[in-house]
Amino acid sequence: MKFIIKLFPEITIKSQSVRLRFIKILTGNIRNVLKPYDETLAVVRHWDNIEVRAKDESKRAAIVAELTRIPGIHHILAVEDRPYTDVHHIFEQTLEMNRERIEGKTFCVRVKRRGKHEFSSQDVERYVGGGLNQHVASAQVQLNRPQVTVNLEIEDERLILVTARYEGIGGYPIGTQEDVLSLISGGFDSGVSSYMLMRRGCRVHYCFFNLGGAAHEIGVRQVAHYLWKRYGSTHRVRFVAINFEPVVGEILEKVDDGQMGVVLKRMMVRAASKIAERYGVQALVTGEALGQVSSQTLTNLRLIDNASDTLILRPLISHDKEHIIKLAREIGTEDFARTMPEYCGVISKSPTVKAVKAKIEHEEQNFDFAILERMVEEATNVDIREIAEKAQEEVAEVETVASFSHNDVILDIRSNDEQEARPLEVEGVVVKSLPFYKLATQFGDLDQSKSWLLYCERGVMSRLQALYLHEQGFKNVKVYRP
């Protein structure tokens, strides 16, 4: 099978040297993501597209799913590469491929041609379109907004028949821009803002301020790992966790109620800036949107920025909440966010919307900055690929099994598209489906007299979810690793 990868249009208008660099990076990213699916897979770069060739037809759906999530790809064409002798031969092959597809529908033919030929692209469009119209009585030519567009590409003596088109997410390939550090809370905003910077070509590292204990960190790890695995797995990234409970305690004790929200955000920016400096990261990313909460007025945002010299990027600054939730739904983080606790909003009962710099600085004089320094020094730094190993250490009390008894039920917690692409079939045991993002709210509805064996392909999500469910009091949970 063969796919032609079309580049994000902004890549094609770059200078020759920049364009070649972007294409080279994108080619490497594609190869890194797809190699586990097919060792014989070939990725070949050209000036205006990238070819992907694979032999294992059973992996087609999985390969397509991965390609649609790699930044830098505008769309993917599944194609069949055939020789041809003349224009009539092109028509015959097109009719064979598209007869059923255009029956009872309006259609048009679009041709792209490269090389020297005795005919033009328009000649082929007219000939093939007219022939299809004659041989498929129920079909009708319609050049504007047809129901079906028959796409053909001709390269020298090769005919490329497009069998399917899949839309990519666009953007720049990850690695073409510098690294950023996302302040992730697990909510709607931080997940979407992280995705938007990945889509713009940045390698996104994650910094989490833990205000709610182990369960909160587990939940945020799941979000970060999901975003990385789905959109950024071409590169290694860090997940840094900072215990901020002592900092919050100091603020509650030493800072005036109305100033707490802004002071807390300034402390977060200071801490994140130190982490960014430690690892050579150029900018911070937050999910703040103008006016969404009291700390996100222009006056307060400016004061928050003044806490550090590090550049702060706010990709959602002009987005409303409805649009942010829609984006979260599209990228798959909505269900995470809906079950994630929010702690920052409850720190102050009557927060100021227009903080005064002198007053904020006066309140911060009462703060013991040694606490902040200590928390930054004690921050944990994990390669996001090692989250599975760290989860394994933390869920030692959660049993991992490869076989099952009469009371066991396997619970496939993979996302719906993964289950459709690679269905789980195990003889001798019932297999049920409940995507991981629904476990927090729906696991309690399952038959608790059964022993539930959580399954995911790599064991990362199943271990994290098993730990979370154990902490919620569900002891009838194990991890299934065949």
From Swiss-Prot:
CDD domains given in the database record: PPase_ThiI, THUMP_ThiI
Any GO MF annotation of the entry: ATP binding
Pathway the protein contributes to: Cofactor biosynthesis; thiamine diphosphate biosynthesis
Alphabetically ordered keywords of this record: ATP-binding, Cytoplasm, Disulfide bond, Nucleotide-binding, Redox-active center, RNA-binding, Thiamine biosynthesis, Transferase, tRNA-binding
GO CC terms in record: cytosol
Keyword Mitochondrion: no
Family matches, as SUPFAM superfamilies: Adenine nucleotide alpha hydrolases-like, Rhodanese/Cell cycle control phosphatase, THUMP domain-like
Xref: PROSITE patterns: RHODANESE_3, THUMP
Any one GO BP annotation for this protein: thiamine biosynthetic process
Active site, UniProt feature: C456 (cysteine persulfide intermediate)
Matching InterPro entries: Rhodanese-like_dom, Rhodanese-like_dom_sf, Rossmann-like_a/b/a_fold, ThiI_AANH, ThiI_fer, ThiI_N, THII_Thiazole_biosynth_dom, THUMP_dom
The THUMP domain, residue ranges: 61-165
Disulfide bridge partners, by residue number: C344-C456
Annotated ranges, domain Rhodanese: 404-482
Residues at which ATP binds: L183, I184, K265, G287, Q296
Subcellular location: Cytoplasm
Domain of life: Bacteria
UniProt EC number: 2.8.1.4
Pfam families, alphabetized: ThiI (PF02568), ThiI_fer (PF22025), THUMP (PF02926)
Enzyme class: transferase
Catalytic reactions on record: [ThiI sulfur-carrier protein]-S-sulfanyl-L-cysteine + a uridine in tRNA + 2 reduced [2Fe-2S]-[ferredoxin] + ATP + H(+) = [ThiI sulfur-carrier protein]-L-cysteine + a 4-thiouridine in tRNA + 2 oxidized [2Fe-2S]-[ferredoxin] + AMP + diphosphate; [ThiS sulfur-carrier protein]-C-terminal Gly-Gly-AMP + S-sulfanyl-L-cysteinyl-[cysteine desulfurase] + AH2 = [ThiS sulfur-carrier protein]-C-terminal-Gly-aminoethanethioate + L-cysteinyl-[cysteine desulfurase] + A + AMP + 2 H(+)
Similarity remark: Belongs to the ThiI family.
Function: Catalyzes the ATP-dependent transfer of a sulfur to tRNA to produce 4-thiouridine in position 8 of tRNAs, which functions as a near-UV photosensor. Also catalyzes the transfer of sulfur to the sulfur carrier protein ThiS, forming ThiS-thiocarboxylate. This is a step in the synthesis of thiazole, in the thiamine biosynthesis pathway. The sulfur is donated as persulfide by IscS.
Protein known as: tRNA sulfurtransferase
